[in-house]
Each structure stands twice: as structure tokens, then as C-alpha cells.
């Protein structure tokens, strides 16, 4: 009976009793995705992918379309909420050793890359001043690729500069990629339930499991309610908190903003890019800041799965968190001392965490095995 399978999938799913609130972010991400697809559809109905009309169509949505302002703000701030949740979700995975479930981790990082691409394309669509220049700077990094760089950039732009074909294809990609995210999310969940969730102790929870519903579903519902409350408070009272003032002006290719920067959720990677005074080196560091997450399942040497009982790894983990926040902050500042030095030091610390995982695991094993 189909009813029985639905119950098995969502209700009778066996879950460890001791998983904490940090395991709630998966369901929150699913809610964010549903919200983004829904609001995105209503925005796409009224949006015009043309460089002369794009900015005006956004103004039309916010002013003339009934509840258009709410859809636009929910979509923009919902993206920020999406990234807050995904960064916490990844941090939890790093702390509790969830990356040892290799297939789930790999599909998750692929999801992150797809999400970042989707968000980047979406940031270009309003065709504001910062949208245009952020697109110019980031896509121009392709020219750093030896031999193929210039051809790749021209192919992506659809011409010799960012123009109407660029906006059209970015809109098409921004519309289609969320469906790839939905497919990858399904794969991610299937692979996760193949092995089952980890837990704060890192032990095998098979002897002590409870049904997902009603126990964990109610716990998920609490945090979902809090997240939606927080989202609607920002949308209602602080709708421009994440916006760049430059983006309220229509794109002008003849006027360069004083300080070009992407959305806040890309600033850590952008800060790493800016800290290297070489185009190719910076582009490689930018790519590696995400790709290095693929390495974590293969560099784990500790006998214990989570960092719960590993003080040295904990110290490095919280250094990574503070480093991430510091790079993000430094990337909002102009390229001048002391911000250049701060970006360079924090970039080194960021990569040091991933390089130190195997060494720290080995040291902690020695300490625990000591008589």
C-alpha cells in the first residue's frame, strides 16, 4: 500500500534519540528551498530579462504588483537565510564528523556549489550598479584560465562584454538550477538514509532509535517556526539590511563603484580571492576555498568521529569559525592596510584548519593511547 510507504519514509524513519538541535538545519534548508522556488516563480512572472527593462521591472514588482514587495524581500532575504542555514549545517558536519559518510558529504558539497552558482546568477538579475559590476569582476576571473580563458569568458558573456545575452542566459540558469538543487537534495537525503544520521557522541545508534514522527518532527517544527518568525521580522522591519546601497541605482558601465563586492554570503571566498595579489593565484584560492571541503573525508585520522572529546580539534574548529567571520568582515572593507594583512592572515588560517585535521587526529590518538 502506498500509504504504508509514505509512513515508513516520513513517520517511522528510525532516528537516534540523542541528536541535538544542530541536526534540525536540514529540514530548515528544505523549507528555505521551497520558499525560494515559490517566491521565485511569482517574481519570474513579472520580471523582464532585458538590460533596459530589468531594473524597471524590479521597481514595478515592488511598487505595483500586489504583495510584490513581500515576494521580492522574501526571495532576497530568504537567500541569506538559506546560506546562514547551510553554513551552520556544514559546520555541524565538520564538528561531528558527518563527512565520514562520504557519499552524503560529496553530494552536499556539490549542492553547495550549485547553490552558490544559483545565488550568483540571481544577484545579477536586478541589473543594479553592484549587480553589474560584481558580475563583471567575478566572470572576468575566467580569463585567468590559461589558453582557454578568453574564449570561455566570451562564451559565457555571449559577446565581448556583459550585455543583453548575458542577462538572458543568467536568468535562464537562475530559473533552471533550483530544479537541479531539488534533484540533488533528494539524492542527498536518499544517501543519508542509506547509512543513517550521525549523532553528537559519534557512536552506532542502532540499539537506541526512535521514530522520526512525532519526536523529531516536533523538534524540527519548533526551529522552523522560529526561523520563519525571524525571516518575517526582517522582511517587515529591516528589508534592506543585506542590500548594497549601490544596487538601488541602475547599472552604468561607465561608472565604477568605489568598492565592488558580492553578497555577504560570498564574502569569505571573495576575501580569500582579494588577499592574493595575482589573478590566477586568487582565482585558484577562490575555487579551493570550497573544493577543499571534498578532502575532509580522506584526511580524518582520529579514532573518534566527532570533536566532542577532542580538545585540540575543537580549538582549531572555533578558530575556523572566527576566521570565517573575520574574512567576511575584512572583505567588506577597501583594499588598503590593515585590511589586506587581515585578509591574508585569515586566509592562511582558513586553509590551515583543513591541513591540520590529519596531524591533530594523529596527535590526539597518541594522547589517548598514552598510559
From Swiss-Prot:
GO terms for molecular function: metal ion binding; ubiquinol-cytochrome-c reductase activity. The keyword Cytoplasm does not apply. Heme b b566 binds at residues 89, 188. Its main location: mitochondrion. It is a multi-pass membrane protein. Binds 2 heme b groups non-covalently. Pfam families: Cytochrom_B_C, Cytochrome_B. One of its GO terms (biological process) is mitochondrial electron transport, ubiquinol to cytochrome c. Keywords: Electron transport, Heme, Iron, Membrane, Metal-binding, Mitochondrion, Mitochondrion inner membrane, Respiratory chain, Transmembrane, Transmembrane helix, Transport, Ubiquinone. GO terms for cellular component: mitochondrial inner membrane; respiratory chain complex III. CDD domains: cytochrome_b_C (cd00290), Cytochrome_b_N (cd00284). Its cofactor is heme b. A ubiquinone binds at residue 193. It is found in: Mitochondrion inner membrane. The keyword Metal-binding applies. The chain crosses the membrane at residues 25-45, 69-90, 105-125, 170-190, 218-238, 280-300, 312-332, 339-358. Heme b b562 binds at residues 75, 174. Component of the ubiquinol-cytochrome c reductase complex (complex III or cytochrome b-c1 complex) that is part of the mitochondrial respiratory chain. The b-c1 complex mediates electron transfer from ubiquinol to cytochrome c. Contributes to the generation of a proton gradient across the mitochondrial membrane that is then used for ATP synthesis. Heme 1 (or BL or b562) is low-potential and absorbs at about 562 nm, and heme 2 (or BH or b566) is high-potential and absorbs at about 566 nm. The cytochrome bc1 complex contains 3 respiratory subunits (MT-CYB, CYC1 and UQCRFS1), 2 core proteins (UQCRC1 and UQCRC2) and probably 6 low-molecular weight proteins. Belongs to the cytochrome b family. PANTHER family: CYTOCHROME B. This is Cytochrome b. It comes from Liasis mackloti savuensis (Savu python).
